[in-house]
Amino acid sequence: MLKIAIDVMGADNGVTPIVQGVIQALKSRDFNAVIIGDEAQIAPLVPPYLQSRAQIVHCTDYIRMEESASAAAKRTQSSIFKTTELLKNGDVDALVSPGHSGATMSLATLKIGRIKGVSRPAICTTMPNTTDKPSIILDAGANTDCKPEYLVDFAIMGYEYAKNVIGFENPRVGLLSNGEEDNKGNELTKATFKLLKEFSFFKGNVEGRDIFNGSVDVIVCDGFSGNLVLKASEGVASAMSSVLKKDIKSCLCSMFGALFLRGVFKRLKKKMDHSEYGGAPLLGVQKVVIISHGSANARAIECAIYQALNAIESNICSKLSDAFANKPSSAQQ
């Protein structure tokens, strides 16, 4: 049975919602959980009938959000260090962490290692759109300064993830720019465009609106731009929800109308709720690593575990290795 390691320390809302998410996942899917954190806080939350499938690795130290990611390599008793060690040694099949994302990325890259041929690992974030399947955008924050060859690697990884894990038959890849024309963009995107033309999956430049209209399935950009897109999208979704709630409560007619539309609102909320998409895989390392939001609730952790299981079952790391082994030399600078 597959084993998933979950680092429950360092999240914004403490241990409880993280463990609750693990419990919900254990009820729904067949796997064993290895929970890394303070046993005194974790043990009372695990029901007796699940204790045989939930091993606890005691640990009280963790990397605080205000600390530098570079501190993680020296903190051998921290929760993320122990979690990464378990994955490195083959004691677990994947890890999920809502803690310090920089520390997770740093340790995963240093200890687990990159897939041969990958220039830089990238954070791959799922974005809702107007179609039945979500879009993905990468990099969403791992690499703020990029070279064209990094973005080419992101495109290859995004294509393979969209095809093998999300289930697109022929994923369409677009390069985020300030216009659709071939000559639009900055020096980075113009140079990247020339390299990506070698790939049949590349559909050209796309604009920010294309992330949400389903015209492409994979959006490639540097980590600085990707993180701005991600945070702006979260902000817009939150603002729209607040405005909608305020307007519904403003008069009796609106409240009655909302009652008739509650099924629509429920489906919309589920589609737009980032918790439903779990976490973000760190693509390009040799094993499955899922980075969750620091404010993740129980549902987000539950879905992040499902992400990890789906990634393992799809054999994504092996698929990425094969893709980079066959990467055309003309797509490299």
Swiss-Prot record:
It comes from the Bacteria. Its EC number is 2.3.1.274. The keyword S-adenosyl-L-methionine does not apply. GO terms for cellular component: cytoplasm. Pathway: Lipid metabolism; phospholipid metabolism. NCBIfam families: plsX. This is Phosphate acyltransferase. It catalyses: a fatty acyl-[ACP] + phosphate = an acyl phosphate + holo-[ACP]. GO terms for molecular function: phosphate:acyl-[acyl carrier protein] acyltransferase activity. The keyword Lipid biosynthesis applies. Catalyzes the reversible formation of acyl-phosphate (acyl-PO(4)) from acyl-[acyl-carrier-protein] (acyl-ACP). This enzyme utilizes acyl-ACP as fatty acyl donor, but not acyl-CoA. Homodimer. Probably interacts with PlsY. InterPro entries: FA_synthesis (IPR003664), Phospholipid_synth_PlsX-like (IPR012281). It is found in: Cytoplasm. The lineage of its organism: Bacteria, Pseudomonadati, Campylobacterota, Epsilonproteobacteria, Campylobacterales. It holds the Pfam family FA_synthesis. Belongs to the PlsX family. SUPFAM superfamilies: Isocitrate/Isopropylmalate dehydrogenase-like. GO terms for biological process: fatty acid biosynthetic process; phospholipid biosynthetic process. It is an enzyme of class 2 (transferase). It comes from Helicobacter hepaticus (strain ATCC 51449 / 3B1). Keywords: Cytoplasm, Lipid biosynthesis, Lipid metabolism, Phospholipid biosynthesis, Phospholipid metabolism, Transferase. Gene3D superfamilies: Isopropylmalate Dehydrogenase (3.40.718.10).
